[in-house]
From Swiss-Prot:
Highest taxon above the source species: Viruses
Descriptive protein name: Uncharacterized 9.7 kDa protein in PE 3'region
Amino acid sequence: MINEVCADAALGRHEARRDRELRTLQSQLYEVCRRSGVADSFCSSLMMSPVGVGGATSKPYFKGGVEEDRVQSSLRRNDVLVVPARVP
């Protein structure tokens, strides 16, 4: 019984730490998004969605004509968001 209580407490601490880390990453992603010239509506949707899940709509998000599918094709490597270059 005591071992189960300790295991539950350790799991709770792990989940709390993971949630804090995810919120931190989400905030960092939001800042990178804002500095990259992405529309405010898309950046704000990142804060409303779980980390790694963007809001899906049919309108373009990048300023300058880059469409949503370019955002969808963004890659994430080693916790760094890599956004494809804009097409001239």
